[in-house]
Amino acid sequence: MSVAEFASLIALLTSLVALSIDAMLPALPQIAADLAVSDPNDAQLVIGLFLLGNAFGQLLFGPLSDTYGRKPVIVAGLSLFLIGCFVSVIAESFSVLLLGRVLQGVGASGPRTVSMSMVRDLYSGRSMARIMSISMSIFMLVPILAPALGQAIMLLVGWRYIFGTFIVFGVLGLFWLLLRQPETLADEHRRPMQLATLISGFVTVYRSRAALGYSLAIGTMFGAFIGFLSSVQQIFQDTFAVGKWFPYLFAILALFLGAASLLNSRMVMHFGMKKIVRLAMACSPVVSLVYLVICLSVDDSGLIGFMVWGALCFFGVGLCIGNINALAMEPLGQIAGLGAAVVGFFSSFVAILVGIPLGRAYDGTQLPLIAGFAILGVIGLCLVYWAGRDTTQETEK
């Protein structure tokens, strides 16, 4: 398999998470109405519980992939994801729909986590960051197109058929993996799955300043992102009264994320991961603090101001994400599968812990979201500098 095809497969497998989130965003108000959800903010649980299942699923699939190999575990995850989609399709109550979303989240964590391990099996250092960045560039087509796709499906045949789209992509990834991708973990490198092994993985990450610091920094960054994803549809619809334009406005923001990720794939080979991460992580708090002051100084900063702020924050995330994941994984080459699981759990747990309350803090204005970005951005930047002082981390390649 060529590098381009491998990066494309990784992008598809990891994009199931983004697809399962972004395509649902336009449908949240309709789901709340059809399933008699009393509090509109409760509809955000369609996103939050998916991410919760995704976080805990990583602890299962990562160690399993170190024992049984990468391919069988990804197949198991995709199968569970498809089951969750079928549950959501037939759901007649909000609680059953949420059950399906949890199953989807757990299942999607398999390809997401183990795909990172496959990359780590074959690449390291800046080469690994480059593969991740190329994958992210392809992956970014999902948030650009998914909201428009979800809205079109909802308007044409109803929101339940959005899950049918998830099934199509899941089946495509399943057969592509089975037919084209060789196993990347040799038999002699596999280890039996034991509770002590899982605990040792947590201890290894905890003792590594780089792995722990970058994992927590990812959590703060994605926590802000979860808050954004959870409340952005309400902001566009209720605050700015442009709900029907939501997919297209969101696509504009996603373009900045994708462009930054593509730019990073070229920059990282020249400037290194740490420099880019530090610069990118500084973007969110600086821009957010400036925009927060503007919003507090004038009665209405307008949609354009919100879009400029969002575009700059998305651009910073695009520059950062491939590099910071690679930096978190760099000290964990000997436990790639377990390491990816623990890093993913740490970052996802932190993200959910701060992201869901941030989304539910929506009060009819964009102010809680902007303040959350500023605070989490400062914390994330401090963590990045702290992690970068780990003298035991491997030199970037």
Name what the model sees in each region.
Residues 100-141:
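Cytoplasmic helix-loop-helix junction between adjacent transmembrane helices
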Residues 96, 126, 130-179, 185:
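Helix-loop-helix hairpin linking two adjacent transmembrane segments in secondary transporters
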Residues 28-56:
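Extracellular/periplasmic helix-loop-helix junction of adjacent transmembrane segments
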Residues 55-95:
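Conserved MFS/SLC helix-loop-helix module at the cytosolic interface between two early adjacent transmembrane helices
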Residues 37, 69, 90-96, 107, ...:
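Helix-breaking motifs and short loop linkers at transmembrane-helix boundaries and internal kinks
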Residues 80-87, 95-103, 304-310:
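Paired small-residue
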Residues 5-37, 228-233:
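Extracytoplasmic
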Residues 184-214:
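Juxtamembrane intracellular "pre-TM" segments in multi-pass secondary transporters
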